[in-house]
C-alpha cells in the first residue's frame, strides 16, 4: 500500500509542446529577445524618431538653424552671451538633442550583444553580403551615426562582422527614406545625386576594400575564439519562461552597464569638444572666399562633428538659401552626419586605430572631392 501510494503521489511528467519537432521551451529565449526588441523599436520609431523626422521634413527651410550641432533647445542664451555662455549652452542643447537617440542606441546595442552571446553569429566571409545585411538593418533604423555607435559596439562585442557594424552605422543616418526625400526636396538634384553617388562608393567599394585590408592584417582566429566563449545551449530547453526571462535580463543588464560605462563618457566628451570647436570657428569669414585650404581645414573638422540625424541636410539647405558658395554647401552635406568623433573613438578603442584613421581620412578626402565636383554639376 505504501508503494502504491508513493507512486500515485509522483507528479505527472510534463508533456512537451512541440514546434517543428522541438520543445517550445527551446524558443523561450528567442521569444523574450524578440518581444523586447519589438517593444523598444515600436516605442522609439513611432513615439519619437519618425514623428521627429517628419517634423524636420515639414519645417525644412521655414526657420533659421540655431546651431550646426544641435536641433533641440534646452538652455537659452542670455541677452549678451559670452563665449563661455555659448559653449555651455551648446553642450547642454547637444545632450538634450541626443538624449532619445543615444538611449535607444545603448538599449539596442546591449540587446545585440546579448543576442550574439546566446546565439553566436556565423562569421561568413562574403564582405558584400555582410555589408548588405548592415545596410538593410541600418537604413530603416533612423538613428544618427553617433547613436548607432553603441549598436555597432554591441554587434562587434558579440563577435559579429565588422563590415556589418560599419555599414549599419553609416547607412542609418544617410539611407533613411525621410532623409533622402529631404535632400532632394530642399536642394537642387545635383547635390542629392552627388551625395548618394559618394555614399554608394563608401558602402559598396571603399568600405569592403578597407575591411578586407583590415582582415588580412589580423591573426587567424580559431573557431573557438571567433565566437563567444560562454555556451548556453545545453540548458536552453530546460527552463521555464520566467526563468529564461530572468536569465536574459541578468545578462542584458550586465551588457548594458558595460556599454554605458564605455559610451556615455565618450558622448559627454564629444559634446564638449564639438561645442568648443563650433563656437570658435569664424564661419562667416571662411564662407566669404573659396580656397583649398579653407575647404580642407573645414573638412578635417566637420567630419568629426557629432550631429543629430538630418541636421546635415538642414544646415546645407540653409547655406544654399543664404547664397553660400556651392563647395561649402556640398562639403557640409557630405561630411556632416556620416562619420564623427564618436564612431572614430569607438573604432580606435574597440576595433583598430588604423581602421579608425583610415575611415576618417577617407571621409575627409571624399568631402573635399565632393566640394570641387559639385561645381562641375552646377556649371
Show where each model-derived region lies.
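Transmembrane helical segments that form the transport core of multi-pass membrane transport proteins
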Residues: 105, 111-123, 249-324
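Alpha-helical membrane-protein architecture signal
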Residues: 84-88, 129-133, 242-253, 297
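Juxtamembrane and boundary regions of transmembrane helices in multi-pass small-molecule transporters
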Residues: 36-56, 123-124, 130, 184, ...
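Alpha-helical transmembrane segments of multipass membrane proteins
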Residues: 109, 141, 202-207, 211, ...
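Membrane-interface helix termini and inter-helical loops of multi-pass transporters
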Residues: 51-56, 81-90, 280-289, 376-379
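Intrinsically disordered, low-complexity non-transmembrane regions of multi-pass membrane transporters
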Residues: 1-38, 54-81, 216-255
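Membrane-interfacial helix-loop connectors
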Residues: 134-198, 280-355, 360
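Individual transmembrane alpha-helix segments
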Residues: 81-104, 109
Amino acid at each position: 500500500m505504501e508503494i502504491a501510494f508513493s507512486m500515485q503521489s509522483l507528479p505527472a511528467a510534463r508533456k512537451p509542446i512541440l514546434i517543428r519537432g522541438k520543445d517550445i521551451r527551446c524558443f523561450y529565449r528567442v521569444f523574450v529577445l524578440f518581444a523586447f526588441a519589438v517593444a523598444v523599436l515600436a516605442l522609439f520609431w513611432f513615439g519619437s524618431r519618425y514623428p521627429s523626422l517628419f517634423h524636420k521634413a515639414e519645417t525644412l527651410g521655414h526657420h533659421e538653424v540655431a546651431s550646426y550641432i544641435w536641433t533641440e533647445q534646452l538652455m537659452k542664451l542670455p541677452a549678451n552671451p559670452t563665449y563661455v555662455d555659448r559653449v555651455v549652452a551648446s553642450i547642454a542643447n547637444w545632450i538634450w538633442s541626443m538624449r532619445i537617440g543615444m538611449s535607444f542606441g545603448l538599449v539596442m546595442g546591449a540587446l545585440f550583444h546579448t543576442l550574439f552571446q546566446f546565439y553566436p553569429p556565423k562569421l561568413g566571409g562574403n564582405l558584400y553580403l555582410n555589408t548588405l545585411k548592415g545596410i538593410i538593418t541600418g537604413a530603416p533604423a533612423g538613428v544618427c551615426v553617433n547613436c548607432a555607435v553603441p549598436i555597432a559596439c554591441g554587434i562587434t562585442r558579440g563577435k559579429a562582422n565588422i563590415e556589418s557594424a560599419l555599414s549599419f552605422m553609416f547607412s542609418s543616418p544617410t539611407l533613411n527614406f525621410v532623409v533622402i526625400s529631404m535632400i532632394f526636396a530642399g536642394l537642387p538634384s545635383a547635390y542629392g545625386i552627388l551625395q548618394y553617388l559618394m555614399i554608394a562608393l563608401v558602402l559598396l567599394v571603399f568600405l569592403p576594400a578597407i575591411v578586407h585590408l583590415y582582415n588580412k592584417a589580423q591573426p587567424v582566429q580559431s573557431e573557438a575564439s571567433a565566437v563567444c566563449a560562454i555556451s548556453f545551449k545545453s540548458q536552453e530547453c530546460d527552463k521555464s519562461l520566467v526563468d529564461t526571462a530572468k536569465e536574459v535580463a541578468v545578462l542584458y543588464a550586465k551588457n548594458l552597464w558595460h556599454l554605458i560605462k564605455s559610451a556615455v563618457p565618450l558622448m559627454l566628451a564629444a559634446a564638449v569638444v564639438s561645442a568648443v570647436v563650433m563656437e570658435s570657428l569664424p564661419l562667416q569669414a571662411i564662407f566669404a572666399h573659396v580656397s583649398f585650404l579653407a575647404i580642407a581645414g573645414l573638412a578635417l573638422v566637420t567630419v568629426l562633428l557629432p550631429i543629430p540625424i538630418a541636421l546635415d541636410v538642414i544646415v546645407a539647405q540653409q547655406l544654399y538659401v543664404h547664397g553660400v558658395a556651392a563647395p561649402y554647401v556640398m562639403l557640409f552635406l557630405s561630411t556632416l552626419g556620416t562619420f564623427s568623433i564618436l564612431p572614430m573613438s569607438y573604432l580606435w578603442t574597440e576595433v583598430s586605430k588604423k581602421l579608425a584613421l583610415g575611415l576618417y581620412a577617407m571621409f575627409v578626402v571624399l568631402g573635399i572631392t565632393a566640394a570641387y565636383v559639385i561645381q562641375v554639376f552646377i556649371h
